[in-house]
């Protein structure tokens, strides 16, 4: 009996030590988010297409042709010293000296619907919300925060091609803002076109085309909801497009199944009386809405938020375990956070079926390789890519 007890205690002790010493537990995604660190705290998997993270302001790249120098501190969308969150967008650069992206921003709200982000000096001037760092959790593959203004808990995780949200609203009706005009390093006219189609009461599809660092960058999406939409609407908030077609005879800003324009901002209202969280899954594709739908189904169908979070955390643990070191906690945190930051970009740029849009604008099929983007080769050839040559399993 004594042998069994000792063996049981040894196993428990070993498992506790193993859990406490997972290398991913040393990663702090908030490191580098202050000043000019140009990192973000949100959820992603190693080299995934999705980098789902909070953006804390909307400073434009230029105003009337004049560069706004403050924008440089927002290369990754998040600035630690800010006290409000504009929303959660699905693409981010990490550690770069220039920026773009911030595609497909979502923000949960309650009460009066506002279709502008407002200003950070007054969070009530738009759909943004204040927050505190004590209510924020950032781990590899997971991010959560409490949005104070509307008392909403927001949680994020990700697969390679899908950003997964879980929002807990107060009892009543909950709103979800989807801003296709938002962007990082944004400016008037950067969004060339955007569209939104309500496929049914739990599914949206659409696209956003931008003219930024990447010229004519096409981002297609499919968005699913765990609750049916009660009502919805939207309008152009960017440069106004000219439309003289038949649909102008209808009110396209309320419960209209298709919307399009240079910079759409839309809202969707849900019944949250039961306190059950609203889960939102946003799949991206550079190819088509059909590609986004396939990414959505193949990567997330049948899996709960918690299961997808666990899968993301396991992917990070495997990736980071390629190098094992020993040291005190500060050294371990510094090392594994740095290693974590090397594994965000380059990022995946192809669908689950292996199709991708090339720089020629055409659709290609991969053959025995994985297609990536965001290489930043003028900086990374010196150290990052030699590191990949050492630690890559391929």
Across the structure, where does each feature detected by a protein language model lie?
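Bacterial Sec-dependent N-terminal signal peptides
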Residues: 1-21
């Amino acid at each position: 009996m004594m042998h069994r007890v000792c063996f049981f205690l040894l196993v428990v002790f070993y498992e506790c030590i193993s859990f406490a010493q997972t290398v991913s537990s040393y990663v702090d995604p908030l490191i580098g988010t202050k000043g000019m660190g140009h990192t973000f705290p949100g959820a992603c998997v190693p080299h995934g297409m999705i980098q789902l993270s909070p953006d804390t302001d909307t400073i434009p790249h230029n105003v009337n042709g004049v560069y706004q120098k403050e924008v440089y501190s927002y290369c990754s969308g998040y600035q630690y010293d800010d006290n409000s969150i504009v929303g959660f967008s699905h693409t981010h650069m990490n550690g770069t000296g220039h920026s773009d992206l911030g595609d497909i921003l979502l923000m949960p709200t309650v009460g009066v619907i506002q279709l502008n982000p407002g200003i950070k000096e007054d969070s009530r001037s738009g759909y943004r919300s204040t927050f505190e760092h004590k209510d924020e959790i950032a781990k590899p593959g997971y991010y959560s925060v409490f949005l104070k203004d509307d008392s909403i808990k927001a949680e994020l995780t990700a697969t390679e091609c899908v950003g997964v949200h879980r929002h807990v609203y107060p009892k009543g009706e909950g709103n979800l803002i989807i801003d296709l005009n938002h962007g990082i390093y944004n400016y008037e006219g950067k969004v060339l076109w955007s569209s939104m189609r309500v496929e049914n009461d739990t599914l949206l599809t659409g696209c956003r085309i931008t003219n930024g660092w990447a010229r004519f960058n096409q981002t297609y999406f499919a968005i699913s909801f765990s609750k049916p939409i009660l009502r919805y609407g939207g309008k152009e908030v960017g440069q106004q497009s000219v439309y003289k077609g038949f649909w102008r005879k209808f009110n396209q800003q309320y419960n209209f199944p298709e919307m399009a324009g240079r910079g759409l901002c839309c809202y969707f209202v849900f019944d949250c009386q039961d306190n059950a969280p609203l889960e939102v899954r946003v799949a991206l594709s550079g190819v088509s809405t059909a590609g986004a739908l396939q990414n959505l189904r193949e990567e997330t169908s049948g899996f709960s938020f918690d299961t997808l979070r666990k899968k993301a955390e396991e992917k990070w643990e495997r990736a980071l375990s390629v190098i094992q070191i020993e040291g005190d906690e500060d050294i371990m945190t510094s090392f594994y956070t740095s290693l974590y930051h090397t594994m965000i970009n380059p990022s995946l740029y192809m669908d689950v079926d292996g199709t991708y849009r090339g720089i020629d604008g055409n659709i290609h099929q991969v053959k025995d390789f994985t297609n990536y983007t965001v290489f930043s080769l003028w900086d990374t050839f010196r150290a990052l890519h030699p590191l990949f040559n050492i630690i890559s399993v391929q």
